[in-house]
Amino acid sequence: MRTVVATSAPKPERAYHLYGLRLRSEWPLPYPRTHGPCLAEVGLVRGASSRFSDAVKQARISTNHEMGPRCVRLADGQTYLQWSGRCEFLVSADGLVVMARPLRRSSPEAFHTYLLGQALSFALIKQGFDPLHATVVVIGGVAVAFLGESGYGKSTLSAAFVRSGHGLLTDDLLVLSDQAHELAAHPGPPRIKLFPEIARAVLGPKVRGIAITRMRKMVIPLEEGQTVGSAVPLKIVYVLGKPAPAGREPETVTIRQLSQRQACIALTRNTFNTVLTDSERLIRQFAFATNVASSVPVKLLTYPRALDFLPTVRQAILADVTRIAG
């Protein structure tokens, strides 16, 4: 097992398990501090302003701009990240350490969202993993993944399953691993992100959360019985079709099996991190997509996006999962 080494910051003291990782964090996180086997380790450490000042100077003079102005690979292999002037990160070249610094006062939930989402995805990829942009629920003991771009309805559909008694495994970022000749889906933070009006309509009028973006999206903590905290075998992947314009939406639920080639393309398009595009990562990404496409069914799911149609969509998915899982 690789050990996190942070030469310029104190050794993290708190250990958490998320996404199959052991996270050694200098920040207290509102998640269980469990122990046991893990896929890899990442240290989450506080960064002094001087460390980031040096990185910003390098980023400004760097000739490598393919990642854009807020994400720059530095000469020593580290990656400098900044999001919306809210927080900045330095991800070590080997992905073992994520150094973080909030740039302005914000809620812990907002900071955790960036730290455990976008920033952590760089560490994952540097350690050889390729996280998917997916939300996953557990149905009858198997993991069912919903893939799709932001705004396609992954979290809304998953919330409908949570409301009906199924557990959420992860929202937005999915890490898979090969275990006992099958793919295992690993749990993320026990929370879901929804717009307030959708949260109240799907989860109930008393639901509460904390706004994290200018678009008013909320982080909603889920109770113990609403989540699953251990790895679950992945049984099927649904790729959500693009929502149709008003007046042109489909009238029924359609589930169509994708060919292995189509599945590979869909899995590649729905990577969580679209920024890292070096040749080594792209080769691993193709191998990963091929492995997933050959291991589980990948299907295209189209349906009307009206909230009152969610029970019908849920029933169609339950019937399909039952046929596959037996």
Language-model features: locations:
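Long, basic/Gly/Ser/Thr-rich N-terminal segments
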Residues: 1-107, 315-326
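Glycine-rich, often acidic-flanked micro-motifs
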Residues: 2-34, 135, 139-149, 163-326
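Phenylalanine-focused residue identity feature
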Residues: 52, 80, 89, 111, ...
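Generic structural signal for well-ordered secondary structure
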Residues: 74, 112-113, 282
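Extreme N-terminal, non-catalytic leader segments
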Residues: 82-143
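Conserved lysine of the Walker
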Residues: 154
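Post-Walker A alpha-helix
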Residues: 157-158
